[in-house]
From Swiss-Prot:
Catalytic function, reaction form: (6R)-5,10-methylene-5,6,7,8-tetrahydrofolate + NADP(+) = (6R)-5,10-methenyltetrahydrofolate + NADPH; (6R)-5,10-methenyltetrahydrofolate + H2O = (6R)-10-formyltetrahydrofolate + H(+)
Zinc found in the keyword field: no
UniProt keywords, alphabetically: Amino-acid biosynthesis, Histidine biosynthesis, Hydrolase, Methionine biosynthesis, Multifunctional enzyme, NADP, One-carbon metabolism, Oxidoreductase, Purine biosynthesis
Pathway: One-carbon metabolism; tetrahydrofolate interconversion
Gene source species: Shewanella sp. (strain ANA-3)
UniProt name for this protein: Bifunctional protein FolD
GO cellular component, one term: cytosol
UniProt subunit comment: Homodimer.
Gene Ontology molecular function terms on file: methenyltetrahydrofolate cyclohydrolase activity; methylenetetrahydrofolate dehydrogenase (NADP+) activity
Family: Belongs to the tetrahydrofolate dehydrogenase/cyclohydrolase family.
CDD domains, per the entry: NAD_bind_m-THF_DH_Cyclohyd
Encoding gene, per UniProt annotation: folD
Length: 284
């Protein structure tokens, strides 16, 4: 068996096309164009690339994108004051603060300062809590994008044994909640997990987000399983690889996401979907 590739790039492009059409329809109806504020503190090269991709995608679908590139020395107090301004700005539907932040700024304080109805990253405790209570509104972008990828396979998720490897606030934990909502029997694995191989070998669906190249050997993948690889790791020779040993895993899986071109584009597409949702549901 050779796995079918889940083409995140193509699915994300389709979502962006639909969003562009909706924005055009809003304009024609005399409605406001959705606005997204993107804040970057410092000059982390990876963050700069991510932020650039998000801004470009915003412009492609016709959103207003407002950029704030702040120096590393920018204080926490000043950043919180900027967020307060944007919270009160009626032209801004979503506020995105690129993580990680410099050491002198507390991530949780910044995330919680963003008004929940403008939290298009889906990180605010209110929005995570809504997901936990099975009434999601603004959902965490990467897990939301992954659910779109899984749905594209046509596989019924109810009753599947799912394993999430990684328990971060950004991917692993909300991913577990999304899979529970989709009817999976879900196991979350982390650095204290024992018998990881045994758990992976039994899984119908595996989502891996640990940031370690080839962390999951391909032979662990159960024949016919769905494999979602969230990792993007750059090797010394410049090659980008995921957290799963792709070549071998692709021989066992029924569906697999490539790296790059799998989960990454969907994270941005979900961010755009959340921004339009915030405009329509909260701010129109």
């Amino acid at each position: 068996m050779t796995a079918q590739i889940i083409d995140g790039k193509a699915i994300a492009q389709s979502i962006r096309t639909q969003l562009r059409e909706k924005v055009t329809a809003r304009k024609e109806a005399g409605q406001r164009v959705p606005g997204l504020a993107v804040i970057l503190v410092g000059a982390d090269p990876a963050s700069q690339v991510y932020v650039g991709s998000k801004r470009k995608a915003c412009e492609e679908v016709g959103f207003i994108s407002r950029s704030y590139d702040l120096d590393t020395s920018y204080t926490e107090e000043a950043l919180l004051a900027l967020i307060d301004e944007l919270n009160d700005d009626p032209t801004i539907d979503g506020i995105l603060v690129q993580l990680p932040l410099p050491a002198h700024i507390e991530d949780s304080k910044v995330i919680e300062r963003i008004r929940p109805d403008k939290d298009v990253d889906g990180f605010h405790p209110y929005n995570v809590g809504r997901l936990a209570q099975r009434i999601p509104v603004l959902r965490s972008c990467t897990p939301m994008g992954i659910m779109t990828l899984i749905k594209s396979t046509g596989v019924d998720t109810y009753g599947l044994d799912a394993v999430v490897v990684g328990a971060s606030n950004i991917v692993g934990r909300p991913m577990t909640l999304e899979l529970l909502l989709a009817g999976c029997t879900t196991t979350t694995c982390h650095r204290f997990t024992k018998n990881l191989e045994q758990k992976i070998r039994q899984a119908d669906l595996v989502v891996v987000a640990v940031g370690k190249p080839g962390f999951i050997p391909g032979e662990w993948i159960k024949p016919g399983a769905i494999v979602i690889d969230v990792g993007i790791n750059r090797l010394e020779n410049g090659t980008l690889v995921g957290d799963v040993q792709y070549d071998v895993a692709a021989q066992n899986a029924s569906f697999i996401t490539p790296v790059p071109g799998g989960v990454g584009p969907m994270t941005i597409a979900s961010l755009l979907e959340n921004t339009l949702y915030a405009a329509e549901q909260y701010h129109d």
